Amino acid sequence: MDVSNENANSSIMTMEANFFMCIIVVFTQVRPVNNPESSAYLFSGFCRHTHKNACFFSFDFFQLVFDASSFAIPATLFYKYTKVTNINMKNITKNQIRMILLSSYLLSLIVGVIYVITYEPDESLEVASETRKFHSTQYDFRYYADITGYQKHFWSWLATNLNMISIFVPPIMSIVFIRLIQIKLNSLKHLFTDKTAAQAKKFDLALTIQTLVPAVCVIPIYIAHLILENYDLPFLSNFEKVLYMMLSLPTAIDAFIVIVTITPYQKAFIAFFKDTFCGKKVSPAIVRRNNISAVSIF
């Protein structure tokens, strides 16, 4: 009886250990090494510069999501620009929809294809075997780059530079689109009522936040990351956690900004719940002045 209880307790403890290890893996980007001679950990940060197949891990999937979401913001601004340039437009054209979707997800699809065609699980075992000859008890990937040479590999170079495009290009695109939108709105001021003008200011503020938050969160943090990872600094693994959070922040707050500050999104959001629970619909706001119909874009 005692033996069965001990086995049950041992099984529960093992399950708890595995559960907490999964939590650690997901939230700290760390995983244990399957090596009886060592209890060290592999940090995905330096692993990315060593051999992708040895660390095809959560950062890679996170990067794919970020590649898509980072271009989604300027794609949204492009849609807003098309609305501003044609205030009587009721529906966006199919070609514009295709362009928005393509510009949002093309880069992440390319990087994803690179990951798929270059991923070979057996190579991770070969890397572990080769590096164990030189560092039998110390599994810090900073020591492995010279052995594998993957940092200079074409696929590594291509994926790294494509990911850098997703860091630096979208904020620049967003700034260009928001400036074009502001210029167009200024040219339409004579059509605005007082209420519409107030909505335009709120709309402009929302677009500014959408543009500045990614630029402030992403570019300085990522540049600091690129600089710091060239040095052997003990806090770098913790700094990478900050990097992940800062990279995800624009995406996390983008939907909130849109719903709170842009009227049609508010109406659509409220209408969704009214349709769901009350069966009522909210009609779109239309501004009419000087015999010109302008569907509210704010």
Curated annotation (Swiss-Prot):
The keyword DNA damage does not apply. Disulfide bonds: none annotated. It is a multi-pass membrane protein. Keywords: Membrane, Transmembrane, Transmembrane helix. One of its GO terms (cellular component) is membrane. The keyword Protein transport does not apply. It comes from the Eukaryota. Pfam families: 7TM_GPCR_Srd. The chain crosses the membrane at residues 10-30, 54-74, 99-119, 158-178, 207-227, 242-262. It is found in: Membrane. InterPro entries: 7TM_GPCR_serpentine_rcpt_Srd, Nematode_rcpt-like_delta. Belongs to the nematode receptor-like protein srd family. PANTHER family: SERPENTINE RECEPTOR CLASS DELTA-34, SERPENTINE RECEPTOR, CLASS D DELTA. This is Serpentine receptor class delta-34. The gene is srd-34.
